[in-house]
Amino acid sequence: MGRPPPCAIQTWILLFLLMGAWAGLTRAQGSKILEGQECKPHSQPWQTALFQGERLVCGGVLVGDRWVLTAAHCKKDKYSVRLGDHSLQKRDEPEQEIQVARSIQHPCFNSSNPEDHSHDIMLIRLQNSANLGDKVKPIELANLCPKVGQKCIISGWGTVTSPQENFPNTLNCAEVKIYSQNKCERAYPGKITEGMVCAGSSNGADTCQGDSGGPLVCNGVLQGITTWGSDPCGKPEKPGVYTKICRYTNWIKKTMGKRD
């Protein structure tokens, strides 16, 4: 566990890309919580929001007092991280905003091809340490991979309707279940790697535009980072796709350890 999948891109994946087989199936850029509800305020104390000025870019997950985990495609030239937030319209008591000091994409992430979602994971080092407490605290990283059928929580400020977009002011949550790798591959033929995990529900609960980089939490442990899925979102037969944390634990810990 913890070893990332190989960086090499298989020839058949490249053929899919060249043929445009991904058209209409991805939503990673910016990538709600469909069929969810408002989270209990500060029940997800590891949830963060990435902002470029006043614009929400992505979600993120606090994994250390100076470290946030998110999707690699969320990287921007200059942006900040908000912690302890619930309502984006008003300042919450525990809310903190810290500038990003450094963005470290996984070395195998292909930033030149927006259709390639492999290794879509990134560590953000904050300029200053976060003030930790009950409403702002890091989450534990998965050492073991999630089990099929396991119930998990997804959260974010992304759109709550699709294809029309309607962004909420408050953090939304929904319950999903882990899909088998075979079921995931049947939903997205030729597009799923061992570094990805699918999760969804029969009622269409799903992440969507604006949720990229946010957490998939199972039994209080971080098992996934929101990356991509179907467009429109919320199709029961087309689950959300997440970067599988258990495959990257070693890289995460090694990268954080080098700079702490």
From Swiss-Prot:
PROSITE patterns according to UniProt: TRYPSIN_DOM, TRYPSIN_HIS, TRYPSIN_SER
Protein name (Swiss-Prot/TrEMBL): Kallikrein-8
Location in the cell: Secreted; Cytoplasm
Tissues in which the UniProt entry reports expression: Restricted to hippocampus.
Glycan-bearing residues: N110
The organism's taxonomic lineage, starting at the top: Eukaryota, Metazoa, Chordata, Craniata, Vertebrata
Pfam families membership: Trypsin (PF00089)
Propeptide: 29-32
Domain of life: Eukaryota
GO BP: keratinocyte proliferation; memory; neuron projection morphogenesis; protein maturation; proteolysis; regulation of synapse organization; response to wounding; synapse organization
Subunit: Interacts with SPINK9.
Organism: Rattus norvegicus
Protein role: Serine protease which is capable of degrading a number of proteins such as casein, fibrinogen, kininogen, fibronectin and collagen type IV. Also cleaves L1CAM in response to increased neural activity. Induces neurite outgrowth and fasciculation of cultured hippocampal neurons. Plays a role in the formation and maturation of orphan and small synaptic boutons in the Schaffer-collateral pathway, regulates Schaffer-collateral long-term potentiation in the hippocampus and is required for memory acquisition and synaptic plasticity. Involved in skin desquamation and keratinocyte proliferation.
Extent of the signal sequence: 1-28
Presence of keyword ATP-binding: no
Major enzyme class: hydrolase
Family the entry assigns: Belongs to the peptidase S1 family. Kallikrein subfamily.
GO MF: peptidase activity; serine-type endopeptidase activity
Documented EC number(s): 3.4.21.118
Swiss-Prot/TrEMBL keywords: Cytoplasm, Disulfide bond, Glycoprotein, Hydrolase, Protease, Secreted, Serine protease, Signal, Zymogen
Boundaries of every Peptidase S1 domain copy: 33-257
Chemical reaction(s) catalysed: Cleavage of amide substrates following the basic amino acids Arg or Lys at the P1 position, with a preference for Arg over Lys
Active site: H73 (charge relay system), D120 (charge relay system), S212 (charge relay system)
Gene3D superfamilies xref list: Trypsin-like serine proteases (2.40.10.10)
